[in-house]
Amino acid sequence: MPITTTAQVPPEVRTYFDRLLLTLARPYFIYDMFAQRRTIPLNSGDQMIFRRYATLNAATVPIQDGTTPPGDSLAVTDFSTQIKWYGNFVVITDQVQFTVQDRVLNESTRVLSLQLGLTLDTLIRNMMVATASSISCQFGGNGDTPTQITTEDIKTAVRALRLGNARLMTKPIPGENRFATSPVRSSYWGFMDVTIQNDLEACADFLSAANYPNPMDVLEAEWGSTNNVRWLLSTNGANSGTSNLGAPIWQNIILGQESFGVVKLGSKEAEFIVKPLGSAGTADPLNQRGSVGYKYPFATRLLNDNWITRLLSTQFF
């Protein structure tokens, strides 16, 4: 079947819809905000290898006069990932008049753009919840296993990340002489579904983002902080399995610096593809069908399980 790409669309139309695609897709990239970003040059294959050198133990043995110490050896760990292509399309009937002002074409682009954002967000989320590091909440009072999330559970997760040498991701926000505000600690970032935001707010040390000393320090989707975690809430949170009482188990992600990476191919953004009415030739003899679609090359990879953890919880409030 003949495929009509953007090369067959007038330049002014291509420019408009490409911008629309990027503008609508990016705000939904919540989970990729703190990724290590890498690019594979075009025509250089489709696999990326992240490499990390192991640290050396402290050299506490004094050097003896005239004696060469045994020395040490370097150890490296490689993490590989492969670019894969993702995409989708919708069919448009002959009611569409192919102009840049056309409402159906515009709305099709809008819907596909939102799907692209959700797709990338979900791919990264699924990669995160695949980490081998997990902690079940146990200090809540809902009588389930795991329990709802509490301050003590969050402290347990923070302690585990600290013991794994995960670096904190934000600097402290110092207090200011403003009514009802409080300072914010240096923090890891946490991801949580909005379904259990009431449980988060019920934590003993929860500080709403509205009560940060400076609202300019608040990220989009940031709900507040507890202990050494600042929380971003999304309707695209993850749950898997059921608890002892049959409730969904929510996967609350807490991470430090350089815990995961994302890879793109060259300078390519999402490719926006329009097939005008009749582009199928004899397969569409009456010019009744066209389509709008996108495709995007992408890969994501966990880089250190000690620097990311899942805090498993159920819902109480």
Annotate each predicted stretch with a short phrase.
Residues 1-82, 308:
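N-terminal "assembly arms/tails" that initiate or stabilize quaternary assembly
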Residues 2-34, 144-171, 187-191, 195-317:
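Sequence/fold signature of self-assembling virion shell proteins
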Residues 36, 142-147, 178-181:
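Surface-exposed ligand/attachment interfaces on beta-rich extracellular proteins
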Residues 38-39, 176-181, 219-221, 281:
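A generic local secondary-structure boundary/capping motif
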Residues 54, 94, 296-300:
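Beta-strand elements of well-folded, non-transmembrane domains
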Residues 73-100, 266:
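Short acidic, glycine/tyrosine-flanked loop/strand segments centered on an H-E-D-like triad
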Residues 99-174:
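Alpha-helical scaffold segments that mediate packing/assembly in large oligomeric complexes
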